[in-house]
């Protein structure tokens, strides 16, 4: 509640009760509540959610099958204990450095494929460096980041585009062994 009300201790409804106008600002936060338009778009998207999940799962299964024969570790999206919404397709390339992965990302870009990294450890970001965070205090975070590449995974990808990503990613990996 605090983040959505500029740090106020009461919401608007609580302040409308007779004699209950008094409130405090706990900290200088933000006003991040959802607008009516955003809510309407969200409700519309929720109707499509099963279709979105199905398409993402289809892409994930194609990627998983294609990458089985390569030295690629992938985030497990589906198991007996959990089911993912398939938001991201994270790969890890054991033995590769961040610099090597950055080169692979550039080579993918040259082929028209937008890849990413999820996520850069907070101690590498200026705001956190300025607060005194040091990367060496978070070795696991760096280890997860060091050789990670996120491949495209969205419902607008056609089957042909998924095949293209698979083809180019594996081709680039073979060249960079």
Feature names for model-found ranges:
Residues 1-177:
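PLP-dependent aminotransferase class I/II
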């Amino acid at each position: 509640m605090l983040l959505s009300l500029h740090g106020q201790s009461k919401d608007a409804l609580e302040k409308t009760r007779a004699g209950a106008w008094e409130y405090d600002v706990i900290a200088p936060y933000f006003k991040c509540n959802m607008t009516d338009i955003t809510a309407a778009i969200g409700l519309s998207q929720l109707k499509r959610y099963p279709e979105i999940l199905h398409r993402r799962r289809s892409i994930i299964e194609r990627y998983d099958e294609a990458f089985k024969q390569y030295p690629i570790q992938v985030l497990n999206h589906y198991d007996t204990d959990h089911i993912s919404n398939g938001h991201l397709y994270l790969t890890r390339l054991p033995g590769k450095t961040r610099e090597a992965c950055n080169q692979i990302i550039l080579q993918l870009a040259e082929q028209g494929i937008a890849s990413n990294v999820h996520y850069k450890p907070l101690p590498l970001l200026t705001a956190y460096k300025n607060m005194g965070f040091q990367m060496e205090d978070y070795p696991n975070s760096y280890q997860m980041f060091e050789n990670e590449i996120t491949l495209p995974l969205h419902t607008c990808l056609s089957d042909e585009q998924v095949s293209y990503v698979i083809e180019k990613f594996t081709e680039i990996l073979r060249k960079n062994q």
